[in-house]
């Protein structure tokens, strides 16, 4: 029985300048690895057996009502502008209206070459597909806006990277796939009518109360400020914050070489291609602001009097650091038991982070221990911790039920790098048990009792670098 879904493909109704229509490249022998039943139910996707799901979510068969296309965009990559990028290995099947009334994109990643593939094969291998599946679902469970994983399928075909690897396809669900780079390409080309139509579309879809291009900018800046504060509160490092990986929806998108830090250090970098540390953990707020400045530059091109609008756009972007700081303070305050932190609490939070850096304490486990037991064992210099702890307990004396506040803000488990690599290595050999175990724990991160997955890596297990690896 053919899979059905409530498709309503608004992007496909825009002019062809925004995309190229094409179908996924069929694969030889698809098989289903995982399917996200609760998400599928929200999307209104009909029931089907594993074989039918494998066929549809590998791109071998189109669901009824799909309008497949590859989207066009540009982007700054590590600060350098690339005037044309686009979906080089992804195809948007279409949009569905979920049972919650929201509009969602359904996209296949690894679905074959497109006109934007730039000599690539358009495919993905199993490792990055499973990484994004687990990490994006973990982020959702952690309360951070994110694209989500609907399905993972094997293609039955190999892909050639440094070696021969099993091919796979990820079905990704997003509020949309509009990026900063989507606006940049039409501003760069001076296609002002297209830029205006794209802006109107984005406002209608993501910021219906926004007043024109600058209203959209204000809404996106606010969403991105909340997003990056969420990352910082979890020790998450995106790794490739290019403008083509910056979503207008304010969702985390394109996980690539992402990672969660183990030992806390503000300068942590994992991405093998980030040689200068541009996207280091501590730089993420600054880069988010920089990306929004690029969005402002693109949006201004359509204004009747762009010079007059520059001042307002500048004020909007310059307000972002304060927005990020406020969102960060709120999240970090809760992690130490303060339900409504004020700027006066910043030294207390920063004092703990400084101590964690000096003592090489584990980021996730330190906050978990504060919430549920005694964090003293996380530190080598316990006298220094005791000094901080005295100030902390004095502050908590005014709080109601701080343990509950902390436990709701501090996960017990994250998808640690060494566990992700372990999961991928096993899956390549046909063993999906580690994937299923990690996924189960990370989708209930505040309640898991899997102490083994909570454990930081040993010296031999540390993963020093991550790779896009697509």
Swiss-Prot record:
Binding, ATP: 86, 88-89, 109, 121-122, 172, 179, 254
Q: Which reaction equation describes what this protein catalyses?
A: L-seryl-[protein] + ATP = 3-O-(5'-adenylyl)-L-seryl-[protein] + diphosphate; L-threonyl-[protein] + ATP = 3-O-(5'-adenylyl)-L-threonyl-[protein] + diphosphate; L-tyrosyl-[protein] + ATP = O-(5'-adenylyl)-L-tyrosyl-[protein] + diphosphate; L-histidyl-[protein] + UTP = N(tele)-(5'-uridylyl)-L-histidyl-[protein] + diphosphate
Q: Which Pfam families match?
A: SelO
Active site annotated at which positions? Answer: 244 (proton acceptor)
| Cofactor(s) of this protein | Mg(2+); Mn(2+)
Does Disulfide bond appear among the keywords?
A: no
Q: Which residues cross the membrane?
A: none
The residues listed in the UniProt record as binding Mg(2+), with positions renumbered to this chain, are 245, 254
Alphabetical keyword list: ATP-binding, Magnesium, Manganese, Metal-binding, Nucleotide-binding, Nucleotidyltransferase, Transferase
Its protein name is Protein nucleotidyltransferase YdiU
């Amino acid at each position: 029985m053919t899979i059905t879904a409530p498709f309503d493909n608004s992007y496909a109704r825009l002019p062809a300048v925004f995309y190229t229509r094409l179908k996924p490249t069929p694969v030889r022998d698809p098989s289903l690895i995982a399917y996200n039943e609760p998400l599928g139910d929200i999307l209104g996707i009909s029931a089907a057996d594993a074989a039918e799901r494998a066929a549809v979510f590998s791109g071998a068969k189109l669901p009824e009502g799909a309008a497949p296309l590859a989207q066009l965009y540009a982007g700054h990559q590590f600060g350098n502008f690339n005037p044309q990028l686009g979906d080089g290995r992804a195809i948007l099947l279409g949009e569905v209206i979920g049972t919650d009334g929201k509009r969602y994109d359904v996209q296949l990643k690894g679905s074959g070459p497109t006109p934007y593939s730039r000599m690539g094969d358009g495919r993905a291998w199993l490792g990055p597909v499973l990484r994004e599946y687990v990490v994006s679902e973990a982020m959702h469970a952690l309360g951070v806006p994110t694209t989500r994983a609907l399905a993972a399928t094997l293609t039955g075909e190999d892909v050639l990277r440094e070696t021969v690897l099993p091919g796979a396809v990820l079905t990704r669900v997003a509020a949309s796939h509009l990026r900063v780079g989507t606006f940049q390409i039409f501003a760069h080309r001076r296609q002002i009518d297209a830029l205006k139509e794209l802006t109107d579309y984005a406002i209608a879809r993501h910021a219906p109360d926004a007043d024109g291009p600058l209203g959209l900018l204000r809404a996106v800046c606010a969403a991105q400020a909340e997003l990056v504060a969420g990352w910082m509160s979890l020790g998450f490092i995106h790794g490739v914050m290019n403008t083509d990986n910056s979503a207008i929806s304010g969702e985390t998108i394109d996980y690539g070489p992402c990672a969660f830090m183990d030992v806390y250090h503000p300068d942590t970098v994992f991405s093998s291609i980030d040689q200068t540390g541009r996207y280091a953990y501590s730089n993420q707020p600054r880069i988010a602001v920089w990306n929004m400045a690029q969005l402002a530059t693109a949006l201004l091109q359509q204004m009747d009097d762009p010079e007059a609008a520059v001042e307002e756009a500048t004020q909007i972007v310059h307000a972002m650091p304060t927005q990020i700081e406020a969102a960060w303070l709120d999240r970090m305050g809760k992690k130490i038991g303060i339900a409504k932190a004020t700027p006066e609490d910043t030294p207390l939070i920063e004092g703990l982070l400084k101590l964690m850096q000096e003592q090489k304490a584990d980021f996730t486990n330190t906050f978990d221990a504060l919430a549920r037991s005694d964090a003293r064992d996380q530190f080598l210099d316990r006298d220094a911790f005791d000094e901080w702890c005295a100030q902390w307990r004095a502050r908590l004396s005014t709080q109601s039920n701080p343990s509950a506040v902390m436990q709701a803000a501090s996960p017990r488990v994250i998808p640690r790098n060494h566990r992700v690599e372990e999961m991928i290595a096993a899956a390549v050999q046909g063993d999906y048990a580690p994937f299923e175990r990690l996924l189960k724990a990370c989708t209930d991160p505040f309640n898991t009792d899997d102490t083994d997955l909570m454990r930081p890596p040993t010296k031999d297990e540390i993963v020093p670098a991550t790779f896009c690896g697509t």
